[in-house]
Amino acid sequence: MKTLSEFIVERQAEYPNAKGELSGILSSIRLLAKIIHRDINKAGLTNILGQSGIENVQGESQMKLDLFAHNTMKAALMAREEVAGFASEEEESFIAFDTERGRNAKYIILTDPLDGSSNIDVNVSVGTIFSIYRRVSPIGSPVTLEDFMQPGNKQVAAGYIVYGSSTMLVYTTGHGVNGFTYDPSIGTFCLSHENMQMPKEGKIYSINEGQYLKFPQGVKKYIKYCQEEDKATHRPYVSRYIGSLVADFHRNLLKGGIYIYPSATNYPNGKLRLLYEGNPIAFLAEQAGGVATDGYRRILDIEPTALHERVPLFVGSEDMVKKAQEMMEEFKE
């Protein structure tokens, strides 16, 4: 069975001018995945569950594991010096790696270090999301905010790690999506899901229906559509919502479905972050044959205006996302 290391080397060999920087970043992420996998698996036995008592830049209480994952990723990237800078959902500003190697590095990375961390103390799947861009500031100088404020269509790689019944690393470099399952007996990620494709049609819708009254009319209509009985379209669909974006998206990637986190009266711009969640998940979805929009626009074409900008997200099987967007358009003001 092919390992992640072998796969990365093979892909790098397809580009004669490649110098291995991107491969080095992926190796750092692989290391991060192993460390977080180890600590999550013993979370109930160590003092890393619960709240840290600190709020992040969004005013949300940070879980202890959020901070652990954030600090672990920052340390792994700084040690390898393969990136010029790093931005995290858990930090107010970006971090420039202001060393000689850091200033001469070509890439920057944005991450949600631990998505769904509020679920960890009840043993529900969580994940890490990452997004990699080529910097736009001059090589040899420290990175600037402009390097991080790029639309998703400029990503060179993106992926996630899902920590569940097994730990999987799923990523794309713009040439399809591949998944690697961690074998703890040998400490290696092995290629288990080659060229992943999201079904064009799906039967699963994932949304927090407890917030129904706060949703836009187009979303309410789509939920009712999913619940109606119609043999021709195999409805009603199945409702499945874990509350962890990575876990919900991973299931829908494999089985077909739609994940929706819309705007709401209490979150008029949506709740998910464009740069840390929306763009990388959208890149993966499109590379697997799916679609990702904010209800009206392609996610990857949105020009960011702030490092922690929020965005509504409709992502999944093509037919389902297009139907939801059609209903959103009906009520567009």
Curated annotation (Swiss-Prot):
It is an enzyme of class 3 (hydrolase). Its main location: cytoplasm. The keyword Transit peptide does not apply. InterPro entries: FBPase_C_dom, FBPase_class-1, FBPase_N, FBPtase, Fructose_bisphosphatase_AS. Substrate binds at residues 115-118, 208, 241, 271. One of its GO terms (cellular component) is cytosol. Gene3D superfamilies: 3.40.190.80, Fructose-1,6-Bisphosphatase, subunit A, domain 1. Its EC number is 3.1.3.11. SUPFAM superfamilies: Carbohydrate phosphatase (SSF56655). GO terms for molecular function: fructose 1,6-bisphosphate 1-phosphatase activity; magnesium ion binding. Pathway: Carbohydrate biosynthesis; gluconeogenesis. It catalyses: beta-D-fructose 1,6-bisphosphate + H2O = beta-D-fructose 6-phosphate + phosphate. Keywords: Carbohydrate metabolism, Cytoplasm, Hydrolase, Magnesium, Metal-binding. Mg(2+) 2 binds at residues 112, 115, 277. Binds 2 magnesium ions per subunit. Its cofactor is Mg(2+). Mg(2+) 1 binds at residues 89, 112, 114. The keyword Cytoplasm applies. GO terms for biological process: fructose 1,6-bisphosphate metabolic process; fructose 6-phosphate metabolic process; fructose metabolic process; gluconeogenesis; sucrose biosynthetic process. Belongs to the FBPase class 1 family. Homotetramer. PANTHER family: FRUCTOSE-1,6-BISPHOSPHATASE-RELATED (PTHR11556), SEDOHEPTULOSE-1,7-BISPHOSPHATASE, CHLOROPLASTIC (PTHR11556:SF35). This is Fructose-1,6-bisphosphatase class 1.
